[in-house]
C-alpha cells in the first residue's frame, strides 16, 4: 500500500466506532483479572451478548500483544453476529469490523485494514459521515462495553441516548438499570428501584438483574422479598459467577458470612484464577475471626480451635489471592483495598506458622509495604526477617503494633 493510502487510512481509523476509539482504559488501569472475568461471563450469555464480549476480549488480547488471539476472538464475534439474522446484525458488526481494521493496522497489514474500513463505509455511506453512524444499536453496544470496563457514568449516558429512540428495548433497559445501580453509591446520584423492576419485566430470564434488585430491597429494609429473589435466581442460574458473587454480597450484608463464603466458593469452581474472588473469601474469614475475638469465653478450647482454623483459612486465601497475580510483585494495586489486605497480614503474622510459610508471608508483606511506600513499616519487617526463628516470636507483637 502506498504512503498516501497509509495517511488516508490513519485519518479514517479514528472515525470508526469501536473499542480502539472509546478510550476504555486509562493507561495501566486494566486489571490483570479482566480477561478471566470476560471469559467466564461468555458461558452464560446469549449469542448477541457473547459477540459483545468477544469483541472486548479481542481488544484485551490486543493490549496484551496477542494479535493472533485477538483476530480469533473477532472471528467468533462475527460468526455470532451473522447467526442473529435480524436487522441489527449488520449494524452491530460495524464495531467488529472497526476492531479488525485497527488490529490489522497495528500488525502492519494495511490492505486488510483497508478492506474492513471499506466494509464499514458500505453500511454507513448513506449517512453524512461515511465511516460512522448514530443509532441506538451502536450506543447500546458501546454502553455494554463501557459497563464491563467499569466506566459506569459513560455507560449510563450511552444507554440514555439509546433509550430516547427505543424506550422499551430490553437490552438497553437492562444496561441502564445496572449502570444506575452501580452509580448509586455516589451521594449526588439518585436511584429508583423502578428502573430495575422495569428492566426485569422486559428481561424476565435475566437472573443478574434479579440479584441486583434483591440487594436494593435489602437496603430498603425489604429483606424477605430480597431473599426470595436471591433464592429464585440461584435456582435458575446456580453456576453463573456474577449471580453467585452478588448473592454472596447479599448474605454478607445480611450477616450470614458462612453462606457468603459458600457461594463465593461455588463461584471459584468455574473461575479458579479469579484473584478478587479469593480476596473476598479471605475477607469473609477475617470478619468471622474478628467476631469470635470480640466474644467472651476466651479460654474455651473449642473457640481457640475455631480461631486457629480461621487464621489458617485467612492465610490460605491470602496466599491464593497473591499467587494469582500476573506481575512480579503480584499486582498489589489490583487487590482489594490496601488497608483490607494489611489487616489480614497483621492478623496472620501475629501467630506462629510453619517456617517456610512464614518466610514467604513476610516477604510478600514487605513487597506490599514497599509498593505502598510505607518505608518505616518495611524497615521493621525486613529487620524481623533477619532474626533467628526463636527470636521472632518475641518481636512479633511489636511489629504488629507498628504496622
Curated annotation (Swiss-Prot):
Induction: Induced by T.gondii infection in the testes and uterus. It comes from Mus musculus. IFN-induced antiviral protein which acts as an inhibitor of cellular as well as viral processes, cell migration, proliferation, signaling, and viral replication. Enhances MAVS-mediated host antiviral responses by serving as an adapter bridging TBK1 to MAVS which leads to the activation of TBK1 and phosphorylation of IRF3 and phosphorylated IRF3 translocates into nucleus to promote antiviral gene transcription. Exhibits an antiproliferative activity via the up-regulation of cell cycle negative regulators CDKN1A/p21 and CDKN1B/p27. This is Interferon-induced protein with tetratricopeptide repeats 3. Keywords: Antiviral defense, Cytoplasm, Immunity, Innate immunity, Mitochondrion, Repeat, TPR repeat. GO terms for cellular component: cytoplasm; mitochondrion. One of its GO terms (biological process) is defense response to virus. The keyword GTP-binding does not apply.
Amino acid at each position: 500500500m502506498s504512503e498516501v493510502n497509509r495517511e488516508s487510512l490513519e485519518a479514517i481509523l479514528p472515525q470508526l466506532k469501536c473499542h480502539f476509539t472509546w478510550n476504555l482504559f486509562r493507561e495501566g488501569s486494566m486489571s490483570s483479572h479482566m480477561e478471566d472475568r470476560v471469559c467466564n461471563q461468555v458461558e452464560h450469555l446469549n449469542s448477541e451478548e457473547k459477540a459483545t464480549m468477544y469483541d472486548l476480549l479481542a481488544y484485551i488480547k490486543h493490549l496484551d500483544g496477542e494479535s493472533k488471539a485477538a483476530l480469533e476472538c473477532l472471528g467468533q464475534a462475527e460468526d455470532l453476529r451473522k447467526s442473529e439474522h435480524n436487522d441489527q446484525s449488520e449494524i452491530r458488526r460495524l464495531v467488529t469490523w472497526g476492531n479488525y481494521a485497527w488490529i490489522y493496522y497495528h500488525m502492519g497489514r494495511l490492505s486488510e485494514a483497508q478492506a474492513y474500513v471499506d466494509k464499514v463505509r458500505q453500511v454507513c455511506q448513506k449517512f453524512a459521515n461515511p465511516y460512522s453512524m448514530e443509532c441506538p444499536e451502536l450506543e447500546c453496544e458501546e454502553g455494554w462495553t463501557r459497563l464491563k470496563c467499569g466506566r459506569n457514568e459513560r455507560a449510563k449516558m450511552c444507554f440514555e441516548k439509546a433509550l430516547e429512540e427505543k424506550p422499551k428495548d430490553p437490552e438497553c433497559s437492562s444496561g441502564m438499570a445496572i449502570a444506575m445501580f452501580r452509580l448509586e453509591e455516589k451521594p449526588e446520584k439518585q436511584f429508583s428501584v423502578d428502573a430495575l423492576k422495569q428492566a426485569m419485566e422486559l428481561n424476565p430470564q435475566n437472573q443478574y438483574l434479579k440479584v441486583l434488585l434483591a440487594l436494593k430491597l435489602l437496603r430498603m429494609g425489604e429483606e424477605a422479598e430480597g431473599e426470595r429473589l436471591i433464592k429464585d435466581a440461584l435456582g435458575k442460574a446456580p453456576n453463573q459467577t456474577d449471580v453467585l458473587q452478588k448473592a454472596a454480597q447479599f448474605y454478607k450484608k445480611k450477616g450470614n458470612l458462612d453462606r457468603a463464603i459458600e457461594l463465593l466458593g461455588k463461584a471459584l469452581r468455574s473461575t479458579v484464577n479469579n484473584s478478587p474472588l479469593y480476596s473476598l473469601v479471605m475477607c469473609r474469614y477475617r470478619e468471622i475471626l474478628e467476631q469470635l475475638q470480640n466474644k467472651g469465653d476466651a479460654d474455651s478450647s473449642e473457640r481457640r480451635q475455631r480461631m486457629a482454623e480461621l487464621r489458617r483459612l485467612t492465610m490460605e486465601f491470602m496466599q491464593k489471592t497473591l499467587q494469582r497475580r500476573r506481575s512480579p510483585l503480584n499486582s498489589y494495586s489490583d487487590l482489594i483495598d490496601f488497608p483490607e489486605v494489611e489487616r489480614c497480614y497483621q492478623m496472620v503474622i501475629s501467630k506462629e506458622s510453619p517456617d517456610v510459610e512464614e518466610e514467604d508471608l513476610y516477604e510478600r508483606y514487605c513487597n506490599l509495604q514497599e509498593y505502598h511506600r510505607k518505608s518505616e513499616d518495611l524497615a521493621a519487617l525486613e529487620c524481623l526477617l533477619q532474626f533467628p526463628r526463636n527470636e521472632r516470636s518475641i518481636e512479633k507483637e511489636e511489629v504488629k503494633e507498628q504496622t
